[in-house]
Amino acid sequence: MSTGKVVQVIGPVVDVAFESGQQVPDINNALKIDKGDGQTLTVEVSLALGDGIVRTIAMDSTDGLQRGMSVTDTGDAIKVPVGEATLGRVFNVLGEPVDNNGEIAAETPRHSIHRDAPSYDDLANSTEILETGIKVIDLLAPYVRGGKIGLFGGAGVGKTVLIQELIHNIAQGHNGISVFTGVGERTREGNDMYHEMAESGVLKQTAMVYGQMNEPPGARMRVALTGLTMAENFRDSEGKDVLLFIDNIFRFTQAGSEVSALLGRIPSAVGYQPTLATEMGQLQERITSTKKGSVTSIQAVYVPADDYTDPAPATTFAHLDATTNLERALTQQGIYPAVDPLASTSSALDPQVVGQEHYEVATEVQRTLQRYRELQDIISILGMDELSDEEKTTVNRARRIQFFLSQPFSVAETFTGINGEYVPVAETVRSFKEILDGKYDDLPEDAFRNVGAIEQVVEKAKTMAQ
């Protein structure tokens, strides 16, 4: 084992010198710094500066570090526990349990967090639809089992609530394994998620990995890889179908940009690291389904200042099979989930995958909403009276469709006071077909808000009429 000394500390970046004759650690090796009080700090090698000096990124706070402290090369990358022992537990970036439920057994297998993506020959593609029970998603931007899904939205439009509802709907009905990775998000939300999963009984089938907002950038940059390594093991060694939730993939990029300048790299567009696309590719290419098992990943993507052209969300787009775009204007109208039905996309919205009827209903819904959007300028300037009878019918139906795309969530019951609704795909397609056929044109618009199936609209309309 090579030993060296700390020679420079700048925030989360630590330079370590190894004397001549010592083996200089490889890139991505984990080094242990002895802080002298029985504590050690793990750092990861990022750059070799020459003359036996390496530049590393700390995985925890560098408070109390001093020049001259002893550093030991572990001879390998960060290794985290994998397999059955991880289920029902909460880990940090180093794979250390943080839930006060005891240590992980020493004989538990451990894997390096840096691994190659599966080879082209091993990949498998699937066209099986993953039912979410959320009308707007199942109808207009359906998810594929074994696919990659992105939830895009600015601050406070409901990404985390949507991910929690998807966990509630899919993980509870899905008998496989779930891995939840919290990357640079609120610790409070992570704590709530843990307790909700424990209460609902899903926790025993779930591994949780957190590197939250208060952690140094090194931890936020690597915690997604820790969660992914656990998911990969369930897929490859046990042939399981795994659900991988990442909240929030933008923070992975953000952490990389925080340390990029300290590592001496020249920033690229908007101050991001020049290696943005490479880092994203290395992570995303590992999240895939193979012939052994599948990984279905659902990733929340923060959109800075609601700007979809920002390099971070724009780079993520290229890797996804389905995108669910959350729109602030819809939250202002009280439509939740605030999914934009025209901007959200899915490669699975194809008659050969979802069936002819589903495809026709979905495209007709989009056509109606698009026509309504085009007519809004005329309505705002000249009013409804200037529209033809056919256009008035289109507008009235579009408004009913827009409100009917909302629905109450189980995870938001405590805030709304309304029981959450799970709507099967067949029910969703039938309901929208009947709205398009004009069967409910006589019911008031407000009856379509925050309900599940179409029968609830009829009941609500009767109640409103009394």
From Swiss-Prot:
Catalytic activity: ATP + H2O + 4 H(+)(in) = ADP + phosphate + 5 H(+)(out)
Membrane topology reported for the UniProt record: Peripheral membrane protein
Disulfide bond entries: none
Major site of localization recorded for this protein: membrane
Enzyme class: translocase
Gene3D superfamilies reported in the protein's UniProt record: 2.40.10.170, Bovine Mitochondrial F1-atpase, Atp Synthase Beta Chain, Chain D, domain 3, P-loop containing nucleotide triphosphate hydrolases
UniProt: ATP binding residues: G153, G154, A155, G156, V157, G158, K159, T160
GO molecular function ontology, one term from the record: proton-transporting ATP synthase activity, rotational mechanism
Known role: Produces ATP from ADP in the presence of a proton gradient across the membrane. The catalytic sites are hosted primarily by the beta subunits.
NCBIfam families, per the entry: atpD
Official protein name in the record: ATP synthase subunit beta
